Amino acid sequence: MAEASSDPGAEEREELLGPTAQWSVEDEEEAVHEQCQHERDRQLQAQDEEGGGHVPERPKQEMLLSLKPSEAPELDEDEGFGDWSQRPEQRQQHEGAQGALDSGEPPQCRSPEGEQEDRPGLHAYEKEDSDEVHLEELSLSKEGPGPEDTVQDNLGAAGAEEEQEEHQKCQQPRTPSPLVLEGTIEQSSPPLSPTTKLIDRTESLNRSIEKSNSVKKSQPDLPISKIDQWLEQYTQAIETAGRTPKLARQASIELPSMAVASTKSRWETGEVQAQSAAKTPSCKDIVAGDMSKKSLWEQKGGSKTSSTIKSTPSGKRYKFVATGHGKYEKVLVEGGPAP
């Protein structure tokens, strides 16, 4: 169980120490390279002094090799997340450099004489290529940093700014809430007597009342005049509804003629009603049709009798007399024969 618990801690440590080890390896490689370069420069200067003060210019390949190591760590850095297990050559170099540093011996660098022996034909065209080398140096010095370098610089600057902001936020003192302040004040202050508590309470109540009064004053006044008018109208409506409605007297209409005036006076006196009662027939068997026929007989009178009388060829005259409802009787008319 102890081994299982210690394994994850060791893995975490290895993950944390990975980038630091990578950075330390790169720093050591740069230091070794700089030492080798300084030794080469010293040996070249010593040879030049012995040879009569002529300073041979470094060949083009050496200049390019001297420029490459400064760019190599940035390209191989991979922002601290490279897998060093896939680079056995670099690991061997790192182990060799560490052994040299631990033993205290200076790092072994190839002498320029050996390089000249390996490359005997380089001095022949040193003078010819010197101008080209100077131009390339100037162009390389004038060229700005590559896009990868600028991206890495921007990322590094952004990360540094974010870290500074987080650090400032952590260092900023938090503003305590009013409840916490009240609690601290109450704890720091000595215990108050009941009279002081009552005084404080009354003062707070008075302040709240003053605030409420100020709010009420700021509110607009209600239209009291309109309310009074509405009350008056309401009371008047109640009074008029409670009273019994009086019949309005109609204006007298002028009667057009004297006949109407006489009938009016007769109605007022009651003569018309008496006359109508007297005119009503006593017999209840009479129908409206019979009454109309009776009126016709009365109006025409003798003309009807003359018309109903008929003469026969014998010279006698007869007439029909109504004996009942729809019944007539033939009666001989006394008198001489028809003319």
UniProtKB/Swiss-Prot annotation:
Residues 1-198, 294-315 are annotated as: Disordered. GO terms for biological process: cellular defense response; cellular response to interleukin-7; chemotaxis; signal transduction. Keywords: Acetylation, Cell membrane, Membrane, Phosphoprotein. Residues 300-315 have a biased composition (Low complexity). InterPro entries: Caldesmon_LSP, Lymphspecific. Phosphorylated by casein kinase II, protein kinase C and MAPKAPK2. Phosphorylation by PKC induces translocation from membrane to cytoplasm. Phosphorylation by MAPKAPK2 may regulate neutrophil chemotaxis. The modification Phosphoserine is found at S24, S111, S177, S188, S189, S193, S252. GO terms for molecular function: actin binding. Residues 32-43, 51-61, 117-140 have a biased composition (Basic and acidic residues). It comes from the Eukaryota. One of its GO terms (cellular component) is actin cytoskeleton. It is found in: Cell membrane. The modification N6-acetyllysine is found at K327. Residues 185-196 have a biased composition (Polar residues). It is a peripheral membrane protein. The keyword Transmembrane helix does not apply. PANTHER family: CALDESMON, LYMPHOCYTE-SPECIFIC PROTEIN 1. May play a role in mediating neutrophil activation and chemotaxis. Binds actin. This is Lymphocyte-specific protein 1. It comes from Homo sapiens. The lineage of its organism: Eukaryota, Metazoa, Chordata, Craniata, Vertebrata.
